[in-house]
Amino acid sequence: EAASDNGFTVDIVGFNEELEKQKNRARNARSNEQSMNIQNEEYLNFKRKSEFVGYTTLEQESTVIGLFKDGKKVNKANGLLFVVLEKTPFYAEMGGQAGDQGIFTYKGQNFDVLDTFKLPNGQHAHSVDFKNQEISVDDIVLACVNTDYRLAVSQNHSATHLLNQALREVLGQHVVQHGSQVTKENLRFDFNHYQNLTVEEILKVEKIVLDAIKKGYEVKTIETSLENAKKLGAQALFGEKYGDVVRLVDM
């Protein structure tokens, strides 16, 4: 009725089709999460603590505290493994941002870290192809993050925040982030709006983002309480879990 009163028509069929697609995507996402968190008890039962140090260093010598192969916890193995370290500089996939890549140096050889993700209890797991080299729990590796990869991903992550602000300026404060995907190559930003953006609106958004990039704003990082972060204007992403202390990035 509101649309009709303002001279608009609503494509009910199209809306229902898109709604069903979104429901399917949500179901698939929940299914993938359940396969990690529920179906694999090996991951669920792994409780050893692992510390993330990747905000202060991108290189760390560390002890292997967990090994998984084909979903099973093992004491030693070769080939494609999920490796958990006592301390790691590798950022795990979270909030739509891709996990770090890089290398592990072990017994004088370099092995590719293909991806980094979180296990159910919060430890960062590294997907590493050790090929024919066997590695054991309690062995020591040198973990080195690919700095170019981290920089490219972090730049695209910063761009999502600039885009969020630009959209709110152009379209209105009703715009809320509903998700994102941030990789080395590009970014995707999901948000709500009443209709498709016009060419004029898109150009305005692009200009605001590009102008902000050209100004080269200083990026400041602080750790504060979740409550204080919200008072400072931080926007919590729906569906994300936050601790009592959060890392607040200001540009």
Segments (PLM) and residue ranges:
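A glycine- and charged-residue-rich anion-binding loop/surface
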Residues: E1-M251
